[in-house]
Amino acid sequence: MDVGAVRVHPFSLSRVIAILSAAIISLSAFKVSGQDLMGPHPYIKAEIIFGGDLMGHGMQIAAAKDETTGTYSYQRVFRHIAPILMSHDAAVANLEVTLAGAPYTGYPLFSSPVAFAEAARDAGIGVLTTANNHAVDRGLQGIRSTIKSLDSLSVKHTGTYSDAADRAARVPLVVEAGGLSLALLSYTYGTNGIPVPEPAVVNLIDRELIAADIERAKKMECDAIVAFMHWGREYDTMPSPFQKELAEWLFAEGADIIIGSHPHVIQPVEHIRSAGSGRDRLVAYSLGNLVSNQRWRRTDGGMLLSIRLSVYGDQLIIERAGYILTWVHTPLSSRGRREFEIVPAAHFEKHFELIGDSSQYNQMRLFINDSRRFMGSNAKSIDELRGERLEMILPCR
């Protein structure tokens, strides 16, 4: 079956045998602290995928609008990556717009139609972080409308709250994924100088606040704590000293995974194997843009980060961490307007006919080559998932 040019669930006998054989060999050989995982001890795993910034520039809003009906649809945006997202137990991305209602606007004060978040949900993104520098672009009404809209879509979210009581009831956000419970926390460096309107709350990067939130997550005995940090300098490919120091502090406090956003370009990823603590760690300083109208070099794409987590007693193991390069294709529609669609870059790289435009194809290749060179030097224990490697993470469900 071929969905959106991404092959899903190819049920060839040889592939099934290969997958089962690999799984049996892996489990039979995999031990933690001398204990065989095939034994009686509890062993639970989950597949989680993280995406970067969901931006909503004016051109994207125009592309989504049906001029005849006045309605909006973003389903095309996510169709090529939906099979990848849906093959995981949970998918999370950063919603860097408000859902404040009309008038719909892009930069600098973002407000997108609810259809944007709806399409992301339909593609498999069930969790959105909302603490970012555009969280208060439309004031108190924008914060409350965004929360209400996401609740109505049954999309889980974390980072902004109607008031202190709302925050107390929602922090941490606990997500069940594949038998594991994940505590998700989201914070931002600021809100573009716009004061947070009372009584609303936006999680800012405040160490006393973060430490208290992590402590609360620990008391809830969640299997893993994931901190989403909106930080760093825009368009810098390397993390700042502040990001590095804060990441070390977050790990020391008890965070297991750190996912960064805001730079709008890919930054390094580090998978840190446990050395005595019994818990693996991972930090992705920035996943880049999942979708936007930014077309400058390195901003026109990003990466999906796929992680297989397992818990064995009190130990957390990141069995596999890999990245999937994504690029924002902007084909010209029959209406004469640019459309927006996120494509798995490695797959489209092999099929020029799926792009059909030399200029865009070459731009995509430039993004791919830049990203592979960068990740080759700045991804610790992380591999690109493409071809057969990508198919192997798509379970036969």
Predicted ranges, named:
Residues A5-A18:
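Bacterial N-terminal signal peptides that target proteins for export
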Residues V6-H9, S28, I48:
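Short non-domain terminal segments
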Residues V16-S28:
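Bacterial N-terminal signal peptides
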Residues F30-R397:
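Acidic, metal/ion-coordinating pockets
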